[in-house]
Amino acid sequence: MTASKKLTGCQAWKALAAHRRNWKLHLRDLFAGDPGRGERMTAEAVGLFLDYSKNFVTDETLKLLLRLAEETGLRGRIEALFRGEKINLTENRAALHVALRSPKGTSIVVDGENVVPQVHDVLDRMAAFAVQVRSGSWKGHSGKGIRNVVNIGIGGSDLGPVMAYEALKYYSDRSLTFRFVSNIDGTDFAEAVQDLDAAETLFIVASKTFTTLETMTNASTARAWLLQGFKGDEKAVAKHFVAVSTNTAEVAKFGIDTANMFGFWNWVGGRYSMDSAIGLSTMLAIGPDNFRDMLAGFHAMDVHFRTAPFGVNLPVLMGLLTIWYNNFFAAETVAVLPYEQYLKRFPAYLQQLTMESNGKRVTLDGMEVDYQTSPIYWGEPGTNGQHSFYQLIHQGTKLIPCDFIAFVEPLHPLGRHHDLLMANVFAQAEALAFGRTLEEVTSEGIPAWLAPHKVFEGNRPSNTILAQRLTPETLGKLVALYEHSVFTQSAIWNINPFDQWGVELGKVLAQRVITELESREEPELGHDSSTNAMIRRYRKFRERME
């Protein structure tokens, strides 16, 4: 048996495949046959409540999924993660984002050294800097305080900070303005700074290597913009730029005082870094105490994931359900539906976390898989999505499992708003599960010709995740829940969720193309005929504009 077939050849996988072939139950049947199902098929930990009763599962299904987790060595993989073993095999690194939120006094050893004190040294430096900026004691080059913060990064250096800022805006200092620049499209930078005063603006340049093309292009443009505001005075850079990086030489060359460089480690992957120094903009927005509360939330979920039995382990259950639909029901996507406007960027954040992690086609030992890996994650906040894509989920031909996320207590209690919002959460999950039969439609006097259009098949599965209130701590728990669900999936699929070689080829080709686009002479093109034609067309139109 080849390495790639170890999964599909294991007994639990075969049993699940047989179980799926015999599956003929509708969610209506499952609830009718088990009056206590809605209370029984739930799990609760660290302040998060998961209702997974509206899924295609019986006790037998759960038993087989849990057996799959055991047979594929999930327990050992979890321990290897937390022990700091080099589980990122292709880069020969640990993947120790859990160390970023480990409390002081704990120990996680990498290459013979406890890294937790290093983590807290950086956090303490971040906190001291945040206090200076937030209090107004950090002065810009003109002597004015900082009123605007612009985070420049891309990928994990942008998606996490943007999501966290939006999610925790309720807790932010509203006297500070925050902007985020990631796209190399000049519009992104131009719009971010068009109404800002250079004398009151601080740039955070977030790039581990300080060589990332998009980030350093935007950083150079920001530097030029700042110097224009200070009539070319190079000394201004040190008071208006800080770096999140590990490349001291490049940071200094840029003009940033290396005392204002906040580092992190090669065992922190970009999409797992929002709770590292990459979260400096988050700390500036919400303050050090709230940031530490967020870290405490992450850590609480870490402990739960590591210690809870799989049958009540929230990330494990969610990961197993994803595998059940992805690999046995051919469901290609997961809809993430937060009924909380502050979480409007959460689905976009999860897109990188899930698909960059598990969008892999070979196993850890380099063998091509013979099963599907990561589904596509997407979504929008409710109730907005109800008036756009929910139609397809309810009555379309695709099976789309959904994650509903909601909070019992509103941050803005305005009249009936929150009750109406929560009514929609519960109603949508119910409608997806149970639908509306032809008999129910016709009993209401609907004409026969119209009745089929009003039938809802139902049998659309969903999870509902409830928490008391959206707080920094709750956000940490929620992000860690999905981090560990992703890890659970990767362990069972036997893939590496911590590398991202798929982003490299386009970068390499882009370097070649930019040389051809900017050449003063007509370049000799060696691409395919389509790419060659587009390059020539672009060059021709650009020449007309010059």
UniProtKB/Swiss-Prot annotation:
EC number(s) on file: 5.3.1.9
Main enzyme class: isomerase
Active site per the UniProt annotation: E356, H387, K507
Keyword Glycosyltransferase: no
Gene Ontology MF terms in the entry: carbohydrate derivative binding; glucose-6-phosphate isomerase activity; monosaccharide binding
Pfam families: PGI
Disulfide bond positions: none
Gene Ontology CC entries for this record: cytosol
GO biological process: gluconeogenesis; glucose 6-phosphate metabolic process; glycolytic process
Location relative to the cell: Cytoplasm
Keywords of this entry: Cytoplasm, Gluconeogenesis, Glycolysis, Isomerase
Gene3D superfamilies recorded: 1.10.1390.10, Glucose-6-phosphate isomerase like protein, domain 1
Pathway of action: Carbohydrate biosynthesis; gluconeogenesis; Carbohydrate degradation; glycolysis; D-glyceraldehyde 3-phosphate and glycerone phosphate from D-glucose: step 2/4
InterPro entries: G6P_Isomerase, G6P_Isomerase_C, Phosphoglucose_isomerase_CS, SIS_dom_sf, SIS_PGI_1, SIS_PGI_2
Transmembrane portions of the chain: none
Catalyzed reactions: alpha-D-glucose 6-phosphate = beta-D-fructose 6-phosphate
Cleavable signal peptide: none
Function description: Catalyzes the reversible isomerization of glucose-6-phosphate to fructose-6-phosphate.
Family: Belongs to the GPI family.
Name of the protein this chain belongs to: Glucose-6-phosphate isomerase
Organism of provenance: Syntrophus aciditrophicus (strain SB)
Gene: pgi
